Design a protein with these regions (language model features):
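Amphipathic alpha-helical packing segments from all-alpha helical-bundle domains
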Residues: 67, 96, 114-139, 152
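Amphipathic, non-transmembrane alpha-helical scaffold segments
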Residues: 5, 13, 59, 63, ...
């Protein structure tokens, strides 16, 4: 069972995530976090020194999530197509819920506080996707693509749609078109469900 300190920290991160997703990074203060969590200022400050530290911790937790960490599945010999399908399903689900996106907050954080941290997270994402695509090519499941090119498309189109969908109505048809394009670029035609 988690200690009271761990549960309080988790409460802070969960409530802060909701605040950042709804309002961006710049508008959120420690007072807002206190109100959302019901903690006193002293209680909150005993866990985090400021909103930037809370936001950085949220990003680290997200980055460590197993859903987009392909290394375990690759080490277990899982099909590259199955790993890709799982990732694309998660991406579609996230695109369908722009209200849960931290894209605006990430942009504001990078401009106001630390662009280098965003670059670090981006490099981690590039490596994860590069490793998966190389794995799929090696296994003969993926086409021989320009890996850097397709990784750039995956990362930047996805993040662009997440940001854009905050201000423009988009449909699931658009989101499926994006993930279907990625499938068609990567998965060998003879191995696709639609062939």
């Amino acid at each position: 069972m988690n200690s009271k300190k761990e549960r309080t920290r988790e409460l802070i991160l969960n409530k802060s995530y909701e605040l950042f997703a709804k309002n961006g990074f710049k508008q959120i203060t420690m007072k807002d976090v206190c109100e959302a969590t019901g903690l006193s200022r002293g209680g909150l400050y005993s866990h985090f020194a400021g909103t930037d530290q809370i936001f950085e911790t949220i990003l680290e937790v997200i980055n460590q999530k197993d859903e987009m960490n392909f290394e375990k599945e690759m080490n277990e010999g899982m099909s590259a197509i199955d790993i890709l399908e799982s990732a694309l399903h998660l991406m579609e689900d996230e695109m369908l819920h722009p209200e849960d996106s931290l894209s605006l907050a990430m942009y504001e954080y990078a401009v106001a506080i630390d662009r280098d941290l965003m670059n670090d997270f981006n490099q981690i994402g590039e490596k994860k996707w590069t490793d998966l695509i190389c794995y799929g090519i090696k296994r003969g499941e993926f086409n021989e693509v320009d890996v850097h090119e397709i990784v750039s498309v995956i990362l930047y189109v996805y993040q662009g749609v997440r940001m854009w969908s905050r201000i423009v109505d988009m449909t699931d048809v658009t989101f499926r078109a994006i993930t279907n394009h990625i499938r068609k670029q990567l998965i060998k035609e003879s191995m696709r469900d639609d062939s």
